[in-house]
Every structure is written in structure tokens, then in C-alpha cells.
């Protein structure tokens, strides 16, 4: 599991 939340790149 990644520590950073999965955000979609703009």
C-alpha cells in the first residue's frame, strides 16, 4: 500500500 493517496494527475 502506498503512503500517498492515489490522485489523478492533471
From Swiss-Prot:
Cellular component terms (Gene Ontology): mitochondrial inner membrane
Keyword field: Membrane, Mitochondrion, Mitochondrion inner membrane
Record pathway: Energy metabolism; oxidative phosphorylation
Disulfide bonds: none
Membrane association type: Single-pass membrane protein
UniProt main location, coarse: mitochondrion
Compartmental location: Mitochondrion inner membrane
Any coiled-coil regions, as ranges: none
Gene Ontology process terms (BP): oxidative phosphorylation
Tissue: Heart specific isoform.
Job of this protein: Component of the cytochrome c oxidase, the last enzyme in the mitochondrial electron transport chain which drives oxidative phosphorylation. The respiratory chain contains 3 multisubunit complexes succinate dehydrogenase (complex II, CII), ubiquinol-cytochrome c oxidoreductase (cytochrome b-c1 complex, complex III, CIII) and cytochrome c oxidase (complex IV, CIV), that cooperate to transfer electrons derived from NADH and succinate to molecular oxygen, creating an electrochemical gradient over the inner membrane that drives transmembrane transport and the ATP synthase.
Family in the record: Belongs to the cytochrome c oxidase VIII family.
Self-association state and partner proteins as the record states: Component of the cytochrome c oxidase (complex IV, CIV), a multisubunit enzyme composed of 14 subunits. The complex is composed of a catalytic core of 3 subunits MT-CO1, MT-CO2 and MT-CO3, encoded in the mitochondrial DNA, and 11 supernumerary subunits COX4I, COX5A, COX5B, COX6A, COX6B, COX6C, COX7A, COX7B, COX7C, COX8 and NDUFA4, which are encoded in the nuclear genome.
Protein name (record): Cytochrome c oxidase subunit 8B, mitochondrial
Organism, as annotated: Canis lupus familiaris (Dog)
Amino acid at each position: 500500500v502506498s503512503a500517498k493517496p492515489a490522485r489523478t494527475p492533471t
